[in-house]
């Protein structure tokens, strides 16, 4: 908490409601306007922000994200708050609570939401952070919502089948389709954020999505990402290399998409299928580094680990 207290996070308007929510309802009704002048208002906001982060993300999340990105605790909390709001995770969690499912099924869905938040938080940390939490949400939420809603129409083959299977599984438990689509997006969250990021450079969202997902199918990106995720991370150095490899794969795809918007998808990453098959045949860390380097070479840049 002291590390957060020493930053300007407690002054961010996005977390100001933590102060009022800390007090009992009767005190909120009578003294809400005076609470911002409470002599411990920064300490209260900090404690609430840290507690909510741990409650929603887990006690080891900060350590893992810090190890992978070098970010401090305040940066991690800012990005996690942005990630949760961009994907509307609070709404899904509220709807899930109202369903009253058994502990096992509830935990399964919550785990998917936690994974989604982790992926999206890491993405924001690697793409400039979220110093302006509200501004980041305003930039990304509309595009992400549009993509999540229409993702089933854009995916093909095994990716489409896996997506639909997950959505059907969740809707059968009682969540509506919009909530189920968010739950099913945990694998795709970094991709969706990357698509919105590129569209913010002046390209129509639909065109970016079509180009990115076409290239993703060509290299079987989800399968490749899972192979990277399965690499060992027992030692800190392994974890850092794996995280760098994962991020480099995302950057390869974003760079390839930017090129495809200019020269067409048929002229970008044409050899991607061979590369992903090679990784699948030998999914160890060194081989993945070499193969992702091949992907990087296809768009004219080098892998940086």
Where do the protein language model's features map onto the residues?
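Ligand/cofactor-recognition surfaces for anionic moieties
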Residues: 1-305
């Amino acid at each position: 908490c002291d590390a957060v207290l020493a930053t300007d996070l407690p002054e961010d308007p996005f977390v100001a409601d933590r102060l009022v929510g800390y007090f009992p309802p009767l005190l909120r009704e009578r003294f809400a306007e005076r609470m911002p002048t409470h002599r411990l208002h920064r300490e209260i906001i900090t404690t609430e922000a840290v507690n909510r982060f741990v409650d929603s993300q887990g006690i080891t999340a900060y350590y893992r994200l810090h190890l992978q990105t070098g970010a401090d605790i305040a940066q991690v909390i800012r990005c996690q708050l942005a990630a949760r709001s961009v994907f509307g995770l609070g709404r899904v969690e509220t709807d899930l609570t109202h369903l009253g499912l058994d502990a096992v099924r509830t935990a399964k869905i919550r785990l998917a939401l936690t994974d989604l938040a982790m992926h999206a938080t890491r993405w924001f940390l690697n793409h400039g952070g979220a110093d302006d939490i509200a501004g980041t949400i305003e930039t990304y939420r509309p595009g992400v919502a549009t993509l999540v809603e229409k993702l089933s129409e854009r995916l093909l083959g095994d990716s489409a089948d896996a997506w639909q299977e997950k959505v059907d599984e969740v809707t059968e438990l009682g969540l509506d389709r919009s909530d189920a689509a968010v739950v099913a997006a945990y694998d795709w969250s970094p991709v969706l954020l990357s698509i919105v990021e590129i569209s913010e450079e002046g390209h129509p969202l639909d065109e970016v999505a079509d180009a990115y997902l076409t290239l993703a199918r060509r290299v079987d990106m989800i399968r490749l990402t899972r192979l990277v995720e399965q690499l060992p991370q027992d030692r800190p150095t392994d974890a850092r290399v794996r995280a760098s490899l994962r991020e480099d794969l995302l950057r390869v795809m974003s760079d390839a998409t930017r090129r495809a918007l200019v020269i067409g998808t048929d002229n970008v990453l044409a050899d991607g299928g061979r590369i992903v098959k090679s990784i699948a045949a030998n999914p160890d860390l060194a081989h993945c580094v070499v193969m992702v380097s091949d992907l990087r070479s296809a768009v004219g840049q080098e892998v940086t680990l």
